C-alpha cells in the first residue's frame, strides 16, 4: 500500500520556514519520496505500518497549514496518470524487495 501525503504550510516568517524545513526533513528521514513540491508518498507493507506512520506524523505535526493523507493500494498507485512529466522509476519508488547479503562480491580480483 502507498501513503500519499499532500501539504501546504505557510512560509512567510522565518519561524514558519523553519517549521516547513523541519517537517520536510522528517518526511525524507521516514522514507517519503517527493512527487511534486508538496506531494510525497511512502511505501507501506501493511495496515499496521500505515497506522504507525500516522502516529509518527501526528507526533511531528507542525500544527500550521494543511496536511492531507490518502492511502491507496499498489495497484491503484500504479494506475496514476501523468499528464506532464514522467513516472519515477527509481528503486526507492518500487515495491520490489531487495535483499543484500554479506559483503560486496564483485568480480574485482
From Swiss-Prot:
Listed InterPro entries: CRISPR_associated_Cas2 (IPR021127), Virulence_VapD/CRISPR_Cas2 (IPR019199)
Enzyme Commission designation: 3.1.-.-
Keywords from the named record: Antiviral defense, Endonuclease, Hydrolase, Magnesium, Metal-binding, Nuclease
GO biological process: defense response to virus; maintenance of CRISPR repeat elements
GO molecular function (one): RNA endonuclease activity
Coiled-coil residue spans: none
Domain of life: Bacteria
Pfam family, one: CRISPR_Cas2
EC category name: hydrolase
UniProt cofactor(s): Mg(2+)
Name recorded for this polypeptide: CRISPR-associated endoribonuclease Cas2
Purpose: CRISPR (clustered regularly interspaced short palindromic repeat), is an adaptive immune system that provides protection against mobile genetic elements (viruses, transposable elements and conjugative plasmids). CRISPR clusters contain sequences complementary to antecedent mobile elements and target invading nucleic acids. CRISPR clusters are transcribed and processed into CRISPR RNA (crRNA). Functions as a ssRNA-specific endoribonuclease. Involved in the integration of spacer DNA into the CRISPR cassette.
Annotated binding of Mg(2+), by residue: 8
Family according to the record: Belongs to the CRISPR-associated endoribonuclease Cas2 protein family.
NCBIfam families tied to this protein: cas2 (TIGR01573)
Subunit structure: Homodimer, forms a heterotetramer with a Cas1 homodimer.
